A protein has these predicted regions:
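Glycine/small-residue-rich loop that forms an oxyanion/phosphate-binding "nest" at active or ligand-binding sites
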Residues: 9, 18-80
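Glycine-rich, proline-tolerant flexible connector loops at the mouths of alpha/beta enzymes
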Residues: 2-22, 64, 129-140
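Charged helix-capping and loop-helix junction motifs
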Residues: 17-27, 109-114, 140-148
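Conserved anion-binding
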Residues: 57-130, 134-135, 206
Length: 211
């Protein structure tokens, strides 16, 4: 239903737009798909978002810039509409508390997960993309404890990522009625699974899935 691309070269691509192949690749991808394309990595200012939208992105993902300056969430949403702004949150459990990390999960912040979600929502984000650092790539299931932890504070569309290894992991995730979507990568890279077969499985479980 949606493709998310996160560029780990970050702000480097914005230094010389003409020489960086990322934008040409992005434009080519956008011309050959019929689903929304969400792109992130290194966004710091309004012009960065404009560049991505002009090269085929439908929505953008921000992370570190929001943690550095939460007011930028509001600034970006005011300019391009909140439906365009997805805030990704990288989380790790430390001393029995879910803590937010930055710089692709390498640096600990002072934010607890629920506190940060409240700020993100108050600043006008349109969507949250939630990732578990420990569960990423595990194929052992989503971090259901983390998802349950935010059940009383989340009021935005929520995409949950990290850990899916089989279809039952998706079924269990969607038992949380506030989860809007499930994101995954490794299950398609390292198994014989396909998106179509996943959707067919979820349909048999009476879940509302677009096939």
């Amino acid at each position: 239903d949606e493709i998310i691309i996160l560029d780990i070269t970050r702000k480097l691509k914005f230094i010389d737009k003409n020489k960086n192949f990322f934008f040409k690749t992005l434009e080519q991808i956008s011309k050959n798909i019929v689903v929304p394309l969400t792109v992130g990595g290194g966004i710091e200012k309004l012009d960065d978002i404009k560049t991505l939208l002009n090269n085929g992105a439908d929505k953008v993902v921000i992370n570190s810039v929001a943690l550095e300056s939460p007011k930028k969430i509001n600034s970006f949403a005011s300019k391009y509409g909140k439906q365009c702004i997805v805030v990704s949150i990288d989380v790790k459990k430390i001393d029995n508390e879910f803590i937010v990390f930055t710089d692709y999960g390498t640096k600990k912040t002072n934010y607890k997960l629920k506190d940060w979600i409240k700020i993100v929502q108050d600043e006008g984000a349109g969507e949250i993309f939630l990732q578990s650092i420990e569960f990423d790539g595990s194929l052992e299931g989503y971090n259901y404890e983390m998802v349950n932890h935010i059940s009383q504070v989340i009021n935005l569309p929520l995409i949950v990522s990290s850990g899916a290894g089989n279809w039952k992991h998706f079924e269990k995730l969607f038992e949380f009625d506030f989860v809007s979507a499930a994101s995954t990568t490794n299950i398609y890279h390292f198994t014989e699974s396909s998106i179509k077969s996943l959707k067919n499985f979820l349909k048999t479980k009476k879940l509302e899935i677009r096939v």
